[in-house]
């Protein structure tokens, strides 16, 4: 079977998935920044769109969002979900695809996870282990 016909095993996104995901990310970010969605919750929040992951068939876009300041995340996710149909139509007009992808909104928790790891690395037990490892390597 030729290589370009093999299914993506889900381990790594294809170049096409990455390219389309970035186009969808730009479209959603632009719509939100311009106030294109008439929703009181979204009008009251600045929402960042750090990442969009596309399914291998490009029919599903998982959009990771984060309200600036990290407040009211659940409220913003509900508002985006409520306006999903409008946003999907806008994405289909702005991004040239055979099918408009279904949109799925998720909270981007990478900053929370990074903060948790930073706190863990600063704990006395981990500091002691790190110091012990560096002493052994000398």
Curated annotation (Swiss-Prot):
One of its GO terms (biological process) is maturation of SSU-rRNA. The keyword Cytoplasm applies. The keyword tRNA processing does not apply. It holds the Pfam family RBFA. GO terms for cellular component: cytosol. GO terms for molecular function: ribosomal small subunit binding. Its main location: cytoplasm. It is found in: Cytoplasm. Keywords: Cytoplasm, Ribosome biogenesis. InterPro entries: KH_dom-like_a/b, RbfA, RbfA_dom_sf, Ribosome-bd_factorA_CS. HAMAP family: RbfA (MF_00003). One of several proteins that assist in the late maturation steps of the functional core of the 30S ribosomal subunit. Associates with free 30S ribosomal subunits (but not with 30S subunits that are part of 70S ribosomes or polysomes). Required for efficient processing of 16S rRNA. May interact with the 5'-terminal helix region of 16S rRNA. Monomer. Binds 30S ribosomal subunits, but not 50S ribosomal subunits or 70S ribosomes. Belongs to the RbfA family. NCBIfam families: PRK00521.2-5, rbfA. This is Ribosome-binding factor A. It comes from Rhodopseudomonas palustris (strain BisA53). The gene is rbfA.
């Amino acid at each position: 079977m030729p290589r370009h016909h093999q299914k993506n095993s889900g381990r790594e996104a294809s170049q096409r998935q990455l390219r389309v995901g970035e186009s969808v990310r730009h479209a959603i970010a632009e719509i939100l920044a311009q106030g294109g969605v008439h929703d009181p919750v979204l009008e009251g929040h600045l929402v960042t769109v750090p990442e969009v992951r596309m399914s291998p068939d490009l029919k599903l876009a998982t959009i990771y969002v984060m309200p600036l300041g990290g407040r009211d995340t659940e409220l913003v996710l509900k508002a985006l979900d409520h306006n999903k149909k409008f946003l999907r139509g806008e994405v289909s007009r702005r991004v040239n695809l055979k099918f408009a992808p279904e949109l799925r909104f998720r909270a981007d928790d990478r900053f929370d996870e990074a903060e948790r790891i930073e706190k863990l690395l600063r704990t006395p037990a981990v500091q002691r282990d790190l110091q012990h490892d560096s002493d052994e390597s000398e």
